[in-house]
Amino acid sequence: MSDTGSSGATARAQSDDRTLAFVVYAMHFVAPFVFGLTALIGVAIAYVRRPAAEPVLASHYRFQIRVFWVGFGLSIVAALAVMFGMGMIVWELAGAFLSDLPTDPTEAVTRNLDVDLPVAAFVSLIIASCAWIATALWMIVASVAGALRLSAGRGIRMKAERP
């Protein structure tokens, strides 16, 4: 009788682990819309649950961790590109405004700033936009694909694991 109770507890634990893996996929899916906060919680869950999970679920937790780190890397690229582009624009505007300051207050109000903004600033902002879009698509598509494989009871084989 203890075997039946033990196998029931094991089945329940596997079911809970499977449900938790679905929850992590949902957190990854929502992450682009909430600035990645749910992905951070999801990857923490995946790191904690992976060692004790059965092989199929462990493969999903490994995949969820990889999805997080790829998304995080793309987000860093986007953030750096935004900082570079905005920094160049602010630098150019500050330089144009602060050079040759007028002494008459009325002249300061009517002054026309003729600024040539650097093309590199706009290119970096375009790169940032592309990186944000790539991050969102990666998080959404990878989480949907993983959830579909999990619902079918199939594991995820990553390139490093293939023979």
Predicted features and spans:
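Membrane-interface extramembranous regions at the lipid-water interface
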Residues: 2-31, 44-68, 110-114, 143-163
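Intrinsically disordered, low-complexity regulatory segments
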Residues: 2-5, 11, 92-96, 122
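Hydrophobic alpha-helical transmembrane segments in multi-pass membrane proteins
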Residues: 19-40, 66-95, 120-143
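Membrane-interface elements of multi-pass transporters and channels
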Residues: 48-52, 84-100, 150-154
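Membrane-interfacial helical/loop segments at transmembrane boundaries in membrane proteins
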Residues: 93-117
